[in-house]
Swiss-Prot record:
Zn(2+) 4 binds at residues 753, 758, 771, 777. The lineage of its organism: Eukaryota, Metazoa, Chordata, Craniata, Vertebrata. Residues 29-76, 162-213, 325-354 are annotated as: Disordered. Detected in brain. Residues 40-51 have a biased composition (Basic residues). It holds the Pfam family MYT1. Keywords: Coiled coil, DNA-binding, Metal-binding, Nucleus, Repeat, Repressor, Transcription, Transcription regulation, Zinc, Zinc-finger. Residues 905-974 form a coiled coil. It is found in: Nucleus. Zn(2+) 1 binds at residues 353, 358, 371, 377. This is Suppression of tumorigenicity 18 protein. A zinc finger (CCHHC-type) spans 344-387, 388-431, 700-743, 744-787, 792-835, 845-888. Zn(2+) 5 binds at residues 801, 806, 819, 825.
């Protein structure tokens, strides 16, 4: 009983107002319950939820007390963190300080039970004996009665006090002075009321004493809780076990109140109650320990799960945030890198396309996303001419005399700076050679080395006059080096634009052995023009004792002037030769050159008479050091050659390069080398020369002379791909344009497959990608469909090819299957190849009207050099002119052999064989085409027949459908009319027996000759009458 009062005092912690309301309510319900039947309190307490919280009774209705689950206490603080404060102060819990109010509801009950009953076992024996002794003294009956009333009040308050109470904070503990008011504790729903008004003064003594003992009980846990805040689970389980003793003690006072109030019976029952309590406490300890262990295990498991899920949620949120940030960072960094990479430099950010309305996007070639000039603008076609001209003037190459064509790396057709200019590269190379030659000339040159270099330079002279030292071991290299002299663009600029390069005379040279020889300088002024062909003399110096400064460059100047002035056929006389130096002047008409480098090739020239001064001796030499050196494409053609051509022929007669006119009878020899030397030895009026020994030319030099670049004005340097330093064909020439390449391809037409309609692709064996003859053609021996001529060609006979033996097939360019003129005829091209240099006109040309054409034999006028005109009618723009000039130096046999080697055909038999095969293919194709035409006519006739049959079938089907519909109508009418008439041995007429009915009727009417009975005749008459109404 004393434990019940101790617990009731500990748990009665409410505010004064709430405690007062609860005490009044308990007193009122206790009086009402005194007349009623008591309820088993043990059973009602056992029905509480496992984690029942007394605060729920104060906050919620009794119906909602069991809604919350006890598992939610996993995340809340346990009873180990409870701190017990003095009785007059507020008891603060760690869970109460948190922001979750639900945690107090689940944690208050077990925490208070554990802390309040923790040390109950220490005072259990002493207090229980003292309480029993006091209760059994003279006033034992009244004390038991008071305790029973208090128990009833406690029970009644427990059942209904949740409706009148409100959630509150932890109230202070009760003091000894407040024991008579007995304020309630709403956390566990048990109320304890004071019955001081009913008890006497003797009853108050034990209560005060008990209150004093309760104060001692509360002070001891306070000290222990401050020292040790973490209480073991065993003490908590023991305290909970002892905390359930008051529950068992409530049963006995209720039973005592019903029995007769005799002192002896009450004393015996109180002793039994104390004994029963001690037994039940031991049983409750075991169950409570198991319960608390399960609660602790569940709390730990819940905390682990809660922590795990919390960490998982945090990880997922971080991962999602990183994924969202990563694309943004990548995009931003990518944009920054792209902008840094492709953004123009600070000084070029203002550069943009000059075309109005263009933002610079869309480069023509697609290599760049933007453009900043007219070169790559896709809207360049729609640009006004003023803007185009203004920008084109700015975008020209700064090198004088350069048109911008012939870019070095071949990625572009033109260039606008010195970086890709071949002329600038040649000038730079020439300057380096000048420096190296100047350094080498200072060291001196031996007589043997000078002799060897002079021998090499007999074919072509270098325009520099200084000496070149070379060791004896590298003699063959020197011969290869000087065998083909590169074209000097700087000298061309000097001739055209008046630039005078510095001349350096070699030192250490020996004096000439002829004292009479005088060196004439050639101070010709080339401000706006080029020297004429007749204003120069040839240099016949061949002796090894002469220095390089004594060699004349007039032959090269004359060749260049002749190439540039071929269309005018200028024939200028040689200038007056004076004894004084610097008296040789070119007084002929000069070629005018405008600021853009365009030459004036008009035919109006002033012819000046020759005024020659006899030389001082027969051995006088005219050696003109080149004040303005000039060479053209390694051609060795002197002024005498052109003068002979001009003197022997008129202005309007085309030049025939197949025969050399300047030779005398003594100089006609079979050796091509001697013929070349004889050309140089030919003497004309106004020239002074000396006989000199002629050393033999090497065969190696002769071969190298044959394989030079055929492009006019190209020295072979500056290969397109950069893999080679020089080239000897048009394929790698940076100065060759597309028209020249197409012309060369047209002239070498034998390298294409002769099969009509075949482009050369698809070799039979697969070893080669293309073929040039019928041997590997997959279409040669197949009976495929031939590209037949169109109907217009069959109708118009005038539009056929004029070449005899040609059927109009096999166009040269491959774009058309047939041709109607001789321009694309492959047979005409073959016949031109057979006789390239004979002046005889072809047979098919006789039928056509004579038109102005190129005077060079074998040239069809296509492929102008500067690409201004599609065709040319003079030698000025002929790309084959340079080749023809070079071929004059060799015999006709070498030329024919070279043509046959390039064409790939060694004899005429193969050509005839190919022609026969082509004719056979044409015949087979014609037969196949005739068969195909027959088949097509048969197919068309069969198709027309099928169409007529189908139309007839459609008509028949329509008629059948109409007849069926009519038959159905007649049958229905017959059935309706004969419905009342019934034949013997047959049922009434219907759709099932309609056919049998009709058959019997037809038999009856067909056999009318028989003698029927009167009944049958009457039936037939009735049938006739019924059928009369049907109209067919």
């Amino acid at each position: 009983m004393q434990r019940l009062k101790i617990k009731r005092c500990i748990l009665s912690q409410k505010e004064p107002k709430v405690a007062y309301d609860c005490s009044m309510a308990k007193k009122r319900r206790a009086e009402e319950q005194a007349l009623g039947v008591p309820v088993n309190k043990r059973k009602s307490l056992l029905m509480k939820p496992r984690h029942y919280s007394p605060d729920m009774d104060c906050k919620e209705n009794p119906d909602n007390r069991n809604e919350d689950d006890g598992l939610e206490t996993n995340d809340h603080s346990t009873a180990d963190e409870i701190v017990v404060k003095p009785m007059d102060k507020t008891l603060h819990l760690p869970a109460q300080e948190s922001s979750l109010p639900k945690e107090d509801q689940y944690a208050c009950y077990p925490e208070l039970m554990v802390k309040s009953l923790m040390h109950l076992g220490k005072f259990e024996e002493s207090e229980s004996v003292q309480t029993v002794g006091e209760n059994l003294n003279g006033n034992g009956i009244q004390s038991l009665k008071a305790e029973c009333d208090e128990a009833n009040e406690c029970f009644m308050v427990h059942s209904d006090d949740g409706r009148d109470k409100v959630h509150h904070s932890q109230p202070p503990f009760c003091s000894s002075g407040d024991s008579e008011s007995d304020s309630d504790n709403t956390e566990n729903g048990w109320g304890s009321g004071s019955n001081s008004s009913e008890d006497t003064d003797t009853h108050k003594g034990p209560k005060r004493k008990l209150t004093y003992n309760r104060k001692d009980l509360l002070e001891v846990p306070e000290i222990k809780a401050e020292d040790d805040k973490f209480i073991p689970c065993e003490n908590r389980c023991d305290s909970d076990t002892s905390g359930r003793d008051p529950q068992n003690s409530h049963m006995e006072p209720l039973a005592v109140k019903v029995q007769p109030s005799f002192p002896e019976v009450e004393e015996s029952e109180s002793l039994a109650t104390v004994i029963a309590e001690s037994a039940e406490v031991e049983k409750a300890k075991g169950s409570l320990s198991l319960l608390e262990q399960a609660i602790a295990l569940q709390a730990e498991r819940g905390s682990v799960f809660h922590h795990t899920y919390k960490e998982l949620d945090r990880f997922l949120l971080d991962h999602l945030a990183r994924q969202r940030r990563q694309p943004k960072v990548t995009d931003a960094s990518g944009r920054q890198i792209f902008n840094n990479k492709h953004s123009p430099r600070p000084e070029r950010r203002e550069a943009k396309c000059p075309i109005p309305g263009c933002d610079g996007t869309g480069h023509v070639t697609g290599l760049y996303p933007h453009h900043r000039s007219l070169s790559g603008c896709p809207h360049k076609v729609r640009v006004p001419l003023e803007i185009l001209a203004m920008h084109e003037n700015v975008l020209k190459c700064p090198t004088p005399g350069c048109t911008g064509r012939g870019h070095v790396n071949s990625n572009r057709n033109t260039h606008r700076s010195l970086s890709g200019c071949p002329i600038a590269a040649a000038e730079k190379l020439a300057m380096t050679q000048d420096k190296s030659q100047l350094d080498s000339s200072q060291t001196g040159q031996g007589p043997e080395q000078a002799h060897r270099v002079n021998l090499v330079k007999q074919i072509e002279f270098n325009f520099r006059s200084q000496a070149i030292t070379s060791p004896r071991a590298s003699a063959s290299k020197e011969q290869e080096k000087f065998g083909k002299v590169p074209f000097d663009y700087a000298s061309f600029d000097a001739q055209v634009f008046g630039k005078r390069p510095l001349l350096q005379t070699g030192q250490g040279q020996k004096a000439p052995p002829f004292p009479e020889s005088k060196h004439f300088s050639n101070p010709v002024k080339f401000s706006n023009g080029l020297p004429s062909a007749g204003a120069h003399t040839q240099s016949t110096v061949r002796a090894s004792s002469y220095g390089h400064g004594q060699y004349s460059e007039d032959t090269h100047i004359a060749a260049a002037a002749a190439i540039l002035n071929l269309s005018t056929r200028c024939r200028e006389a040689t200038d007056i030769l004076s004894n004084k130096p610097q008296s040789l002047r070119a007084k002929g008409a000069e070629i005018e050159v405008d600021e853009n480098g365009t030459l004036d090739l008009s035919m109006k020239k002033n012819r000046i008479l020759d005024k020659s001064i006899p030389p001082t001796s027969s051995h006088t030499t005219i050696a003109t050091p080149s004040s303005s050196p000039f060479k053209a494409s390694s051609l060795l053609v002197n002024a005498a050659f052109y003068q002979a051509l001009c003197d022997q022929e008129g202005w309007n007669v085309p030049i025939n390069y197949s025969k050399s006119h300047g030779k005398t009878e003594e100089e006609k020899e079979k050796d091509p080398v001697n013929s070349l030397e004889n050309l140089e030895e030919k003497k004309f009026a106004g020239e002074a020369s000396i006989p000199s020994p002629k050393p033999k030319l090497h065969t190696r030099d002769l071969k190298k002379e044959l394989i030079t670049c055929p492009t006019p004005g190209c020295d072979g340097s500056g290969h397109v791909t950069g893999n080679y330093a020089s080239h000897r064909s048009v394929s790698g020439c940076p100065l060759a344009d597309k028209t020249l390449k197409s012309l060369m391809a047209a002239n070498s037409q034998e390298l294409k497959c002769p099969t009509p309609g075949c482009d050369g692709s698809g070799h039979v064996t697969g070893n080669y990608a293309s073929h040039r003859s019928l041997s590997g053609c997959p279409r040669a021996r197949k009976g495929g469909i031939k590209m037949t001529p169109t109907k217009e060609e069959k109708e118009d006979s005038e539009l056929r090819c004029p070449v005899i033996g040609c059927d109009g097939q096999g166009h040269i360019s491959g774009k058309y299957t047939s041709h109607r003129t001789a321009s694309g005829c492959p047979l005409a091209a073959k016949r031109q190849k057979e006789n390239p240099l004979n002046g005889t006109p072809l047979s098919w040309k006789l039928n056509k009207q004579e038109l102005p054409h190129c005077p060079l034999p074998g040239c069809n006028g296509l492929g102008h050099v500067n690409n201004v005109f599609v065709t040319h009618r003079s030698l000025s723009g002929c790309p084959l002119n340079a080749q023809a000039i070079k071929k004059v130096k060799v015999s006709e046999e070498l030329m024919t052999i070279k043509l046959k080697a390039t064409g790939g055909i060694e004899g005429d038999e193969e050509i005839r064989h190919l022609d026969e095969e082509i004719k056979e293919l044409n015949e087979s194709n014609l037969k196949i085409e005739a068969d195909m035409m027959k088949l097509q006519t048969q197919i068309t006739s069969m198709e027309s027949n099928l169409k007529t049959i189908e139309e007839e079938n459609k008509l028949i089907e329509q008629s059948n459908e109409s007849l069926l519909k009519e038959l159905a109508g007649l049958s229905q009418a017959l059935i309706s009319s004969l419905a009342d008439i019934q034949l013997p041995q047959m049922g009434p007429i219907n759709e099932q027996n309609f056919e049998a009915y009709v058959n019997t009727l037809t038999d009856m009417y067909s056999n009318l000759e028989r003698d029927y009975s009167p009944e049958c005749k009457a039936l037939l008459e009735s049938i006739k009458q019924a059928v009369k109404g049907i109209h067919v």
